[in-house]
Regions:
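Amphipathic, heptad-repeat alpha-helical coiled-coil/stalk segments that mediate oligomerization
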Residues: 1-205
């Protein structure tokens, strides 16, 4: 039920586990086991949730981040003033997660790409990040930190594009260009998903 789903997400540990399992399921759906690592550890002792082996054996770090508490308060707020307040808190939460990924997991000296993916397991949360934050460009902030935001619906397309580009270019020389191209693909995919959602709502009415 919806109630039990919300109750589950009130527990940060269970919420984190659900996000990690969602990421693992997405990776396993599209790639054979020898192409990815679950819980890849760095010399610092930190572990990224997943690392995808690209064609030239460079690792693409992917970490699941699920910012739920202030998002739920934002959704349930009863007026625009409260919504704006929780929206700012939600943005702050997301920014901290982006900074964490950028600092801990983008480690070219240890064989990673010089950018990473932040996997947002809930489409509604992802959509809020990309489309509905007033006066804030989350994607631009993430780009400057070399982090690309993806969701279950945009994950496969994003990684497929990255793999293709890795076959043809030296990634460290082209990172910003690739990130911008990828963001365009992801944004178009997210818009298409939203268009289908609106069409479904229209047809059901």
């Amino acid at each position: 039920s919806v109630v039990s789903f919300q109750d589950l997400f009130r527990n940060p540990k269970l919420r984190g586990q659900w996000g990690e399992m969602s990421l693992e399921a997405s990776v396993a759906q599209y790639f054979p086991k020898d192409r990815y690592i679950i819980q890849h550890y760095f010399s610092s002792g930190e572990a990224v949730d997943a690392a995808l082996r690209l064609p030239n054996d460079i690792l693409l770090p992917i970490d699941s981040k699920f910012n739920w508490d202030n998002f739920q308060k934002l959704v349930n707020a009863d007026n625009e003033i409260h919504k704006d307040g929780y929206r700012k808190l939600f943005y702050s939460d997301v920014k901290k997660k982006i900074d964490e990924i950028s600092t801990k997991y983008i480690l070219p000296a240890e064989g990673t790409t010089d950018f990473a993916l932040m996997f947002v397991p809930a489409e509604t949360v992802y959509y809020e990040m990309i489309n509905n934050l007033k006066d804030v460009d989350i994607a631009d902030y993430a780009r400057k930190r070399k982090v690309i935001l993806v969701s279950p619906n945009t994950f496969a397309l994003s990684v497929s594009a990255i793999q293709h580009w890795y076959r043809d270019v030296h990634i460290n020389q082209k990172t910003q260009s690739i990130i911008k191209k990828l963001e365009t693909i992801v944004a178009d995919s997210a818009k298409l998903s939203d268009d289908f959602r609106k069409l479904g709502n229209h047809l059901s009415n």
